[in-house]
């Protein structure tokens, strides 16, 4: 084995005290195996049985916390009615002694399936855009508070289902749209006035989840967050060569990361970043992912997950 890969096989201790035997992770992948009510099926169970010994952490594909958050017809939904089916998933994921993580999200503005079935797709603002192909309904403050509670209830269900942790998906969908300069046009405490107000929903959801975890989960329960470091919107009326309109910048994300690191989280997951437009904004074209993740690592090194 090449020496540079040796560290991947070494144990690592998370901030919550849990030691993982290696540093391999199965990243979240949506396999579209759920039934039409969001319940896992044997397709999901068998998928995880085949991969149960591949990594120390196994993370499910995106799992909705609301019927109004479904982005596809066979997406996982962590609802009361699906709890027993999720217990089969965790049993399969943990069958070789590794840790099972559920990635939780709300589809928000991208919840096309919810729009088709229930008549509404929700976002921070009503927006005249050619990206979606269907109208957005602006969330009221009361609805936002309900969504925060739904994340908390889904956290309870994740604990009861036997998951060892949760990854909060802040990289796209509802939370991303509130953090976005493009999608968020609100003028209230959840609005676009400042980075603090654009970050408010992410932090409120995280705080609700932490409250439940502290009250109900084992001390070594894992809590991670997934970010999209930087993003630009390219609509049909834009040329990709112009770089698109800013959704959020790396500096924006670093601000939100630091706010989240004031809370008891165990890791930060940086996904592939931006779209075609993001690459046009680089001062130096090259190994883009290494440049961006390297910057993020400098900000978090020793504070969350000592990679």
Give the residues covered by each predicted segment.
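Flavin-dependent oxidoreductase catalytic cores
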Residues: 1-307
